Amino acid sequence: FEILSLYIDDIPAEDLRALTRKTYTAEVYCNARAGDNTADITPLRTLGEEGGAPLQLLGLSNGPTLAFKDMAMQLLGNLFEYVLDKRGQSINILGATSGDTGSAAEYAMRGKHNVKVFMLSPDGKMSAFQRAQMY
């Protein structure tokens, strides 16, 4: 919220705070690895030490599609729904992907009022995992 509020001035602070709290929850980011706490949302793991400093890895793939893109897309879905509701508008989103961007976008917009997503993908050019996420 603190960083977003520096750049988003057309959504009241209390609404923006509520949107970020709705987005970044353990329920949404529930795919933690063994040993990680889902409440951390983006767990920080210490892998070792290099030159006297800890070598750390920030986990960004605990979202619904296991892609780091969930970190932004989930918020974007909630922002779209909020703004469209306030304006009384709807939106159709047309995308094309051969990877996890499409599934992250689809999951982020799933169930959002006034948002429809149409995603194109190349026939036979996606991994089995990516196809399973998309269809």
Regions found by a protein language model. Give the residues of each.
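PLP-dependent amino-acid enzyme catalytic core
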Residues: 1-135
